[in-house]
Every structure is written in C-alpha cells, then in structure tokens.
C-alpha cells in the first residue's frame, strides 16, 4: 500500500515508535530514501526520518533520477506549489533560479515531471516530520558521470551555507550487501575515479544510481558521516539497503 493510501495515524505511529528506539540528530544534512514509500518499507524509512531533530530546515531539496524528454539534463519543475493529501508546499523559487543561473544543464522544465516521480512520496513523509518548509525538485534525466558530477558540484557550492536538507531517492535490493560495502569502501578511500568507473561501468544494481552517487559526492565534500543502517547489526532494513543519512560529525570537547 502506497504512503498516500496510509492514514495519518499509521505514519505517525511508525515515526513515534522509531523515535523511542533511536537518538535524534540535529545535524543531518542528507537523507537517502527509497524512490517509493509504502507499507512494506515504512518501518525502515521511519527509522531514518525519525532521527531528524529539532532542526528547522528552510528548504528540502529532493533529487531523483527520472526519464524525460527535456533537452537539458537536470530539469527542475516549474510549479509554484505542490499539493499532497496533507496540504500545499511552496517551491523555493529563489533557490531554483540560483541553480538555473549556475549552469546551462539546469533548466526549469516540466517534461520529466509526472505523477510517478518520487517527490510525492517524500513530501508526505516530510510533512509528518518537519513543520514549515519549502521544496525544490531536481531531476536527473541522464546519469552519465559528467552530469552527476555537475549536479554534485553545484549543490556543494550553492547549498553549503544554507539551512537545507537534501533528499536523494535511490534503491538497492537486500541481496546486494556486498555491492554496498564495495561502494562505501570506495568513498572511504576518497577514490573518485573508481566511483565514476562504478557509475559508468553499467554494473551497478542501484536504481537511481545518479542520485545515489551525487549524494555520496556531496557528503564527502562536506565531510559528513555517511550511515547506512544495513551495514550495522542493529539494522531493520529489509527492502532497501540504501535507506540512510549523512550528518555532521560531532567534535570532541576538550577541557
């Protein structure tokens, strides 16, 4: 059952249960979320979203891979508001223009925007987690490394000093744990060349691999701690190995 068919009470109960079991973080900058949220993965999605602390994010940027006919490869839908069953959410028009001014491949275009985009599911979850926020949707219609690196570089620069949460939509089936371990090892070794080989080689099992890799690149650039629950013994991740987050590392306090 898709999240749009779940009741408010079901979603809130799942989040509440996970809040009791996890310690919230007030420094999460990135979330990796499945492209579709439903009754089968609500528990694992809640385990991540429930860790959002009291941070008052001004904007949530949702990045996803979605095929379309747009000539430019990084389109952003033109809507001023987007409607969910829980109300309207306003677009951050200024931020959208900032990206459009950054590079020619960012373009305000609706050709890749339809009812199947992941954005709808993510917003419903966010409306149960955050109070007031704006949204920016960025789509990747070409997952070649040139465009993925271009997107990551723009986000690194434009969003670094902004009070923004970035949400990357991607999936990896539960039997691909060795693949996830290999990618994490590549990131930890700071080997961007090997990461691009993984992206371009055609062997990746990740659905939404462009969004996944761009998220890893931004997290690495910002010095964030990347956490995938599937790599830890306390994991309850059963459907998507990539459900996770990246947060600021806590600094030691010396007295």
Per-region residue spans from a language model:
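Active-site histidine-anchored catalytic micro-motif
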Residues: 1-224, 232, 236-238
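Long, Lys/Arg- and hydrophobic-enriched amphipathic alpha-helices
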Residues: 232-255
């Amino acid at each position: 059952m898709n999240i749009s068919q779940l009741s408010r009470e079901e979603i809130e109960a799942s989040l509440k249960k996970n809040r009791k079991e996890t310690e919230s973080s007030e420094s999460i900058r990135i979330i990796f979320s499945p492209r579709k949220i439903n009754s089968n993965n609500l528990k694992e999605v809640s385990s991540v979203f429930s860790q959002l602390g009291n941070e008052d994010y001004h904007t949530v940027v949702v990045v996803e891979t979605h095929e379309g006919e747009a000539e430019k490869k990084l389109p952003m839908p033109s809507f001023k508001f987007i409607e969910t069953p829980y109300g309207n959410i306003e677009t951050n028009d200024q931020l959208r223009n900032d990206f459009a001014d950054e590079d020619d491949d960012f373009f305000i275009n609706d050709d890749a925007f339809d009812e199947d985009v992941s954005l709808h599911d993510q917003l419903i979850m966010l409306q149960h987690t955050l109070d007031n926020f704006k949204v920016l949707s960025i789509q990747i219609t070409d997952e070649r490394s040139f465009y993925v690196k271009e997107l990551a570089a723009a986000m690194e620069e434009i969003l670094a000093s902004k009070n923004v949460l970035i949400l990357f939509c991607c999936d990896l089936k539960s039997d691909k744990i060795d693949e996830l371990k290999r990618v994490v090892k590549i990131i930890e070794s700071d080997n961007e060349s090997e990461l691009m080989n993984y992206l371009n080689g055609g062997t990746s099992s990740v659905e939404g691999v462009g969004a996944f890799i761009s998220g890893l690149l931004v997290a690495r650039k910002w010095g964030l701690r990347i956490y995938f629950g599937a790599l830890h013994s306390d994991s309850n991740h059963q459907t998507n190995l990539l459900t996770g987050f990246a947060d600021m590392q806590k600094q030691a306090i010396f007295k």
